[in-house]
Every structure is written in C-alpha cells, then in structure tokens.
C-alpha cells in the first residue's frame, strides 16, 4: 500500500446525551486555522493554536461549509476528512466492529447527517473535535485517558469513560503509551494500527512528534515497538496518512535507533 496523504476529508455522565438535536442557542466556535472547537462564549484567541477570533466560525456555519467525507481504507475502516480542509486538519477513523460502529478520534466539523456511531475512542486530547456535539446527537460514549481528561484544554468536553492503562473492547485493543501527551493511547483493530501523530511522516524522514514534551515522547516510543514488533498487521492509520505496516514499522525502528545515538 502506498502512502496516502490527504489534501482537502473527569467523568461527565451528568451531561445530557442522545437528544438527536443541537440547540440553536448552543455556543461553540471552530478555529479555521487548526480546527479546534471552543465551547461557550467566543474567546479572543484559540487556546490550541493562538489564532485570533477573526479566524473563528460558529459551529452551525462550519457545518454548512465543511463536509465530513468518508474515504474507504478497507472493508471495516473508513477515514473521515473535512472538505474543504479545515485548518491543519486531522483524520478520524470509523471502525465497523461486530459490536457496532465506533470512531477513533473525532472530526472537527459537526455534520448531523453522518452515519451514527456508538462510541468514540481518543488517542489523546488534541483531537477532541466536535465530540461533545456528536455525543449529544447519538448518545455516543466518549473514551479518553484520565491523564488527558484532566488537562485544561480537554475539561470543557464531556468524557464518559476516563480510562487508565490498556484495555480491549469491541475487539479494539488500546495501549497506553504516554509521551506526546500524558494519556496518549494507540489502538489496534484486526489488521490496522491507529497511531495518530506520535511519529510522522511515513518514510525515511519520519520523526517523533516535535510538539509537546520531547524527552517523554522519545522515552515512551519504545513501548510502541514492543507492542507491534511481533504483530502481523497490514495498515497504519495516522493523523494525515495511511500507509503499509511493514515499511512503517521498519521506518519506526530506524527512527528509534537514530534517537538512541543522538
């Protein structure tokens, strides 16, 4: 499989869920520079990327402009991207499990006409997207590592399961890595690894994510290799790429070797 880069796709159980509609009075703003969603009154700057409020659009205006578009990865995984591209953009992934459909991470744009899912499993707090609105629309259960759920940027978003450690659910295996963010978690479902943005791009120029705590990111990276070293997988789904597993694993090994000798 060749590398595909896209161009233009606290427990909070007291929150109401499953209303199937979003109030017209709901205040939520989307940063068109990075795609971050801000709940409540419009702030002066984006707390994620620092863009000024002239780069924000209201959530319902964003719904009209940005269409979350599916791109098939295989028979059971679909990549979701906004068209046109919404800022930096990140991909979310829909998985058709035997126990129902779920997402890995969440689109930044809210589109109420998407096919419903039952749960959202997050790699980390950077890609919460419009998860609060999808949760309200479909009663989708939100899963985010407890260490990330308590970070200020994540606190406005309801989390149904602030998990800890590794777990398996619906056939999806979750592995707590840490590093790039305290709660960073990667997922494996059948033949697919969901690595998000821990290391990118695929190929000889791969690097560890340069944003966030560099030492922790480097120190925790071997945990990824431990998990995948004996796995017979086929595909790697990242925050802006889809690629073949064996070559990605070799590139990741070389990256860690370079990091050791640096």
Which residues make up each language-model segment?
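Short Cys/His-rich micro-motifs in 6-15 aa windows
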Residues: 49-61
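A general structural motif
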Residues: 99, 116-117, 139, 232-234
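Short amphipathic alpha-helical segments and helix-helix/interface helices
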Residues: 92, 110-112, 131-135, 221-228
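Active-site HxH/HxHxD metal-binding segment of metal-dependent hydrolases
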Residues: 85, 107-169, 256-258
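Conserved beta-strand hairpin/beta-sheet module of binuclear metal-dependent hydrolase folds
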Residues: 64-110, 185-201
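Active-site-proximal loop/helix segment associated with metal-binding centers of metalloenzymes
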Residues: 83-90, 146-147, 152-156, 202-212
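Metallo-beta-lactamase
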Residues: 19-44, 52-55, 101-102, 150, ...
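A broadly conserved sequence feature marking short terminus-proximal activation segments
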Residues: 1-27
């Amino acid at each position: 499989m060749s590398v595909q880069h896209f161009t233009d796709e606290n427990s909070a159980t007291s929150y109401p869920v499953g209303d199937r509609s979003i109030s017209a009075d709901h205040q939520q703003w989307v940063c068109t520079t990075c795609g971050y969603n801000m709940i409540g009154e419009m702030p002066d700057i984006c707390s994620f990327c620092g863009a000024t409020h002239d780069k924000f659009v209201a959530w319902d205006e964003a719904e009209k402009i940005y269409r979350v578009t599916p791109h098939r990865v295989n028979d059971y995984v679909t990549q979701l991207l906004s068209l046109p591209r919404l800022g930096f953009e990140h991909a979310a992934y829909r998985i058709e499990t035997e126990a129902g459909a779920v997402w890995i991470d969440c689109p930044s744009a809210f589109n109420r006409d998407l096919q419903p899912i039952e749960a959202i499993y997050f790699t980390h707090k950077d890609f919460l997207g419009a998860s609060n609105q999808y949760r309200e629309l479909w009663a989708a259960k939100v899963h985010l590592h407890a260490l990330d759920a308590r970070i200020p940027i994540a606190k406005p978003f309801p989390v149904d399961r602030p998990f800890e450690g590794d777990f398996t659910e619906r056939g999806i295996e979750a592995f707590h890595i840490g590093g790039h963010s305290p709660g960073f978690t990667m997922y494996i479902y059948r033949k697919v690894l969901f690595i998000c943005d821990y290391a990118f791009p695929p190929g000889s120029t791969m690097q560890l994510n340069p944003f966030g705590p560099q030492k922790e990111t480097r120190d925790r990276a071997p945990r990824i290799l431990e998990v995948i070293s004996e796995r017979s997988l086929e595909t790697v789904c990242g925050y802006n790429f889809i690629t073949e597993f064996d070559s990605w694993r070799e590139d990741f090994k070389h990256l860690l070797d370079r990091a050791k000798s640096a």
